[in-house]
């Protein structure tokens, strides 16, 4: 192989390594964002369950009050 071909090959390898490094950084950033999104999702699910419980409690109280009104 000539020196020129080896230089071209070296340049392409360096470029490929740089691309791989950039992609690895991007993957790490996306993993962090995914983890943050998962945590936010878990928090929202927990809040949703709490609100459903409160809603059910209010419905029971309302039924009880309506039952008392019917008895009057």
From Swiss-Prot:
<keyword id="KW-0131">Cell cycle</keyword>
<comment type="function">
    <text>Non-essential, abundant cell division factor that is required for proper Z-ring formation. It is recruited early to the divisome by direct interaction with FtsZ, stimulating Z-ring assembly and thereby promoting cell division earlier in the cell cycle. Its recruitment to the Z-ring requires functional FtsA or ZipA.</text>
</comment>
<keyword id="KW-0132">Cell division</keyword>
<keyword id="KW-0175">Coiled coil</keyword>
<feature type="compositionally biased region" description="Basic and acidic residues">
    <location>
        <begin position="42"/>
        <end position="57"/>
    </location>
</feature>
<dbReference type="InterPro" id="IPR009252">
    <property type="entry name" value="Cell_div_ZapB"/>
</dbReference>
<dbReference type="GO" id="GO:0005737">
    <property type="term" value="C:cytoplasm"/>
</dbReference>
<protein>
    <recommendedName>
        <fullName>Cell division protein ZapB</fullName>
    </recommendedName>
</protein>
<dbReference type="Pfam" id="PF06005">
    <property type="entry name" value="ZapB"/>
</dbReference>
<keyword id="KW-0963">Cytoplasm</keyword>
<comment type="similarity">
    <text>Belongs to the ZapB family.</text>
</comment>
<dbReference type="GO" id="GO:0000917">
    <property type="term" value="P:division septum assembly"/>
</dbReference>
<dbReference type="GO" id="GO:0043093">
    <property type="term" value="P:FtsZ-dependent cytokinesis"/>
</dbReference>
<feature type="region of interest" description="Disordered">
    <location>
        <begin position="34"/>
        <end position="57"/>
    </location>
</feature>
<feature type="coiled-coil region">
    <location>
        <begin position="2"/>
        <end position="72"/>
    </location>
</feature>
<comment type="subunit">
    <text>Homodimer. The ends of the coiled-coil dimer bind to each other, forming polymers. Interacts with FtsZ.</text>
</comment>
<keyword id="KW-0717">Septation</keyword>
